[in-house]
Regions:
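Catalytic P-loop NTPase motifs of RecA-like helicase/translocase cores
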Residues: 1, 76-79, 98-102, 129-130
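Walker A/P-loop NTP-binding motif
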Residues: 3-18, 40, 109-111, 141-142
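Conserved Walker A/P-loop ATP-binding site and its immediately adjacent core
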Residues: 5, 18-41, 129-134
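Conserved P-loop NTPase motor "coupling/switch" region that bridges the ATPase
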Residues: 19, 48, 90, 107-190
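Conserved helix-turn-beta segment of the N-terminal RecA-like "Helicase ATP-binding" lobe
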Residues: 30-54, 142-145
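Conserved helix/coil segment N-terminal to the catalytic DExD/H
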Residues: 55-88
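Walker B catalytic acidic pair
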Residues: 94-95
Length: 190
């Protein structure tokens, strides 16, 4: 579902000449099994390559004519400078929970790669997997003006402090998270 939907939407934007290049950031385990296979199945007319291996090879692939470049989370850090110069119009992050913490090096690197003209699509089945505050890092990337500048401000919007070290979600926390993650598309099983 998610992968095919993204491929069709990106292909449509390419057909309309709105975007030219897409960087897909995903776990190593699904680079081939999900992304490369689905791109071959749903967009076989597009040039696709996987940026994996030695840094020089990754840089060459990022600088190539590939319309879709697939790279794993850790690979982004290795070749972030090449990515910044790679003229990507759309960055797709699959399993976006890997970017829930804005204090991590991974999050900071992705944040620096985002330019005003860069589109960012973050895919996740669980934007607030453990707690409503887990959505902060994702929301800060997707909609930076939709959340407080600092984590503590968001935490105070979605959580109540019970004791010095215990916080519980506020009754309207899910609505606050939903608003913070806009614009978003949400599919349910119903």
């Amino acid at each position: 579902g998610k992968t095919a939907s993204v491929i069709w939407a990106a292909d449509y934007l390419m057909t309309q000449k709105i975007i030219k290049r897409v960087l897909v950031i995903c776990p190593l385990s699904i680079m081939d099994s999900a992304w490369r296979n689905d791109l071959f199945r749903f967009a076989m007319h597009r040039r696709v390559d996987v940026a994996y291996g030695k840094p020089e090879k990754r840089r060459d692939i990022i600088g190539s004519e590939a319309e879709f470049v697939i790279i794993n989370f850790d690979g982004v850090e290795i070749v972030s400078e090449a990515i910044a110069n790679g003229k990507f119009d759309l960055i797709v992050v699959d399993e976006a929970n890997a970017y829930k913490n804005p204090q991590t090096k991974r999050w900071k690197i992705l944040s620096k790669l985002l330019q005003p003209h860069t589109w960012l699509w973050m895919l996740t089945g669980t934007p607030a997997s453990q707690s409503p505050v887990d959505a902060y890092g994702i929301a800060k990337l997707v909609n930076p003006d939709g959340v407080p500048r600092f984590y503590g401000g968001f935490r105070d919007q979605v959580m109540n402090k019970v004791t010095q070290f215990k916080w519980v979600p506020k009754p309207d926390a899910n609505n606050t998270v939903h608003k913070a993650l806009q614009p978003a598309i949400r599919f349910t099983k119903e």
